[in-house]
């Protein structure tokens, strides 16, 4: 049995949160693991985890399992980890996956091809894309995801995705995205998917005051997220930062993703993207950004000093040929670095397992085999992502008191045959690409590899109908 040198856990002990009820009064027990990963420093061979009221109440080693639980899930010798956390996504884009006219373009070509299609988005389309996207995320072991919805051809689309996440019981960080610079204003999108600064600010405050839940263990939170430096006005960037400060919510945007963005900022604002980002008040520890491929060494140091987090999106950047983020250097500077799927029309999937594996491969391609191990990649997809969302106290680990979000991975698959010496390395090198059990807030949402969503088949049929309409195929 694999026992990492850093495992100092007393496998005989049961660590409880101190609840006054009986120690065996638990809602759910996951037992008989091959290896239980608590966090980046603690692993328990054969470990178990008990949940109560949607949180981790106790963990322990073989032979110390509590009795009297309401439901028991046998891991049956499988790997158990904290749930993976997605720090950058565009769920609505699964309605235009692998759209042939866009797949071989640059970032700006890709966007200008798809913007006219996305102008057909409505509440039904957002609901269906969110439902199907969450199902896919759950199957890939994701228990928390943000979503960056920045196309608003119709009002209250963010409301539709929040209602859908609540319906499923998924932990969801909605972001009120925005675009205000249409092609007529020197931007890229058509007027049909943009709004005025005043419209964006008013609705941003409405969404936060209506839906944002700052309480511990919250399933729904809201952040503010102008799309990018080239898609909104300077005034909106600055006023959004001020609004986030007043409402005490987080900030998100795309930053330094593409050389075209760099040229745009130089031509429009007379400075590089990071300098512009700092000038509008975004250089703060309430901010995390997507991609961050092209900052230079001095800019990375300034971002790190400010506590800005980064959502690393390896697949979309590789598919579009957009470059590779210097993740090793960022982590060495202490920056919060998490994993993001990015859009389902750029990455063309919503598997955080695949993105975590992609991060491992890219890091080793850039820096050699010592640059990253599977545990480092897992730490990025859990604790690192939780830091980006400002929730590393309760997400990204399985210490008692944490939110009850965890995944059982099937290490008995054909793809893992012969892998005996290190289950974490085998998990990311060999497979599995699909979760066996996914638990969110103590609720089993994937069981034996199947999403526990009775409406999924019907939603898939409806999704296909709407996707064909949006792609103008009917």
Which residues are covered by each model-predicted region?
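Active-site microenvironment of metallo-dependent hydrolases
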Residues: 1-47, 52, 382-474
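Active-site gating loops and adjacent loop-to-helix segments of metal-dependent hydrolytic enzymes
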Residues: 95-126, 181-197, 218, 259-286, ...
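Alpha-helical scaffold segments that flank or form the walls of functional sites
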Residues: 97-171, 201-216, 464-466, 472
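Metal-coordinating catalytic core of metallo-dependent amide/deamination hydrolases
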Residues: 156-292
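Glycine-enriched alpha-helix->loop->beta-strand junction motifs that scaffold or abut catalytic
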Residues: 169, 241-250, 282-285, 302-311, ...
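His/Asp/Glu-enriched, well-ordered alpha-helical/loop segment
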Residues: 279-286, 328-413, 430
């Amino acid at each position: 049995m694999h026992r990492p040198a850093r495992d100092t856990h007393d496998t005989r002990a049961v660590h409880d949160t101190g609840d006054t009820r009986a120690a065996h009064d638990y809602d759910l027990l996951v037992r008989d693991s091959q290896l239980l990963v608590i966090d980046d420093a603690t692993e328990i061979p054969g470990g178990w985890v008990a949940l109560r009221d949607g949180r981790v109440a106790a963990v322990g080693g073989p032979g110390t399992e509590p009795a009297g639980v309401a439901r028991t899930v046998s891991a049956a010798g499988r790997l158990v980890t904290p749930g993976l956390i997605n720090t950058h996504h565009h769920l609505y884009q699964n309605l235009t996956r692998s759209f042939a006219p866009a797949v071989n373009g640059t970032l700006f070509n890709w966007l200008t091809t798809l913007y006219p299609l996305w102008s057909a988005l409505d509440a039904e389309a957002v609901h269906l894309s969110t439902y199907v996207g969450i199902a896919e995320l759950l199957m890939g072991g994701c228990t928390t995801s943000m979503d960056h919805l920045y196309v608003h051809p119709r009002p209250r689309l963010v409301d539709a995705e929040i209602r859908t996440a609540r319906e499923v019981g998924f932990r969801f960080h909605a972001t009120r995205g925005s675009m205000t610079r249409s092609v007529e204003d020197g931007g890229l999108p058509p007027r049909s998917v943009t709004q005025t600064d005043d419209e964006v600010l008013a609705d941003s405050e409405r969404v936060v005051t209506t839906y944002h839940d700052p309480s511990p263990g919250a399933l729904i939170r809201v952040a503010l997220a102008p799309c990018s430096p080239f898609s909104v006005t300077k005034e909106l960037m600055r006023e959004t930062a001020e609004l986030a400060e007043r409402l005490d919510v987080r900030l998100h945007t795309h930053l330094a993703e593409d050389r075209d963005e760099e040229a745009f900022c130089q031509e429009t604002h007379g400075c590089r993207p990071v300098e512009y980002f700092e000038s509008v008040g975004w250089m703060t520890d309430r901010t995390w950004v997507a991609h961050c491929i092209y900052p230079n060494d001095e800019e990375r140091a300034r971002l790190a000093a400010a506590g800005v987090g980064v959502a690393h999106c390896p697949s979309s950047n590789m598919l579009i040929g957009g470059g590779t983020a210097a993740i090793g250097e960022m982590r060495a500077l202490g920056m919060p670095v998490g994993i993001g799927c990015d859009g389902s029309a750029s990455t063309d999937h919503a598997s955080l397992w695949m993105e975590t594996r992609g991060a491992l491969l890219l890091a080793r391609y850039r820096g050699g085999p010592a640059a990253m191990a599977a545990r480092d990649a897992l730490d990025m997809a859990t604790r690192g992502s939780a830091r980006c969302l400002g929730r590393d106290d309760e997400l990204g680990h399985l210490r008692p008191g944490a939110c009850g979000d965890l995944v059982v991975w099937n290490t008995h698959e054909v793809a893992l045959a012969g892998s005996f010496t290190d289950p974490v390395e085998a998990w990311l090198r060999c497979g599995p690409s699909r979760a066996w059990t996914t638990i969110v807030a103590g609720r089993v949402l994937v069981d034996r590899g199947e999403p526990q969503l009775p409406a999924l088949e019907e939603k898939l049929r409806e999704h296909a109908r709407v996707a064909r309409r949006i792609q103008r195929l009917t």
